[in-house]
Amino acid sequence: MLRHFVPLLCLCLLAVPAWAQSDTVAEPAAAGPAPEKILVVGQRPGPGLWKISKGEHVMWVFGAYSPLPAKMEWRAHEVEAKLSQSQEFLSPPSTGIAAGYGAMTALPFMVGFKNNPDGAMLKDVVPADVYARWLPLKAKYIGENDGIERERPMFASDELFRKGLAHAGLSGNTGIDKKLYEIATKYKVKVTRTGVTTKIESPVKTIRAFKKSTLNDLACFSRSIEQLETDLDAMRIRANAWAKGDIAVIESLKFADRGDACADAVMTSVV
């Protein structure tokens, strides 16, 4: 069940009998999911918490999801109550890049880093059939923008996907991770980060090499287009289901996420 939630955010604490009695379980949906045109707004609780225990040790698991309704605000009362009494907060798994103090010296070299090498256009670097699918989506969600045709597939598809979500009333910037860190900081809970960060020793050299390199980002581009073509309605249903805590609906929907393909394009580049 938990495979449907990315990332998993864990709240680790000692067991308290009263909590075991108040563990929240979402009620199953009465019927299968149907196309939804209206997204939920206002404060919503999300799916609640899952309890994992062994002896006196208890771990509360919170399943995050993205994108969510742009006008929804996560109501964090239940999670705050558990996290405030926790011994440790495990951050969601992630990958990142750190440039250190040399980042400032690399700023002048960042100009044009999103563009394809040697002045190539998008139509020159992606398969013709995929580019033909890109054009109507670009017209619908982005509009006139010649500059984006010079960008690498990964960056162009990211802009397209972001605009597509906004058009559907969704947002990938959920603010949930930030809220969890704020709660942990407020109650002085130990934070254990589970992400992996790649340190760049020479940012200027890396940027120069990156601008000349060819990325393995066609899968990212293709999956972004596929998800906008086939999964947008399902994303709206999942977003509403997460906001309402309707786990049965979330479990019933399958989807091909673009996230892994796009993350791989970055982490397997010259960086």
Annotate each PLM feature.
Residues M1-H4:
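Positively charged n-region of N-terminal signal peptides that target proteins for export
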Residues V6-P17:
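Bacterial N-terminal signal peptides
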Residues A18-S22:
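Boundary at the C-terminal end of the N-terminal hydrophobic targeting segment
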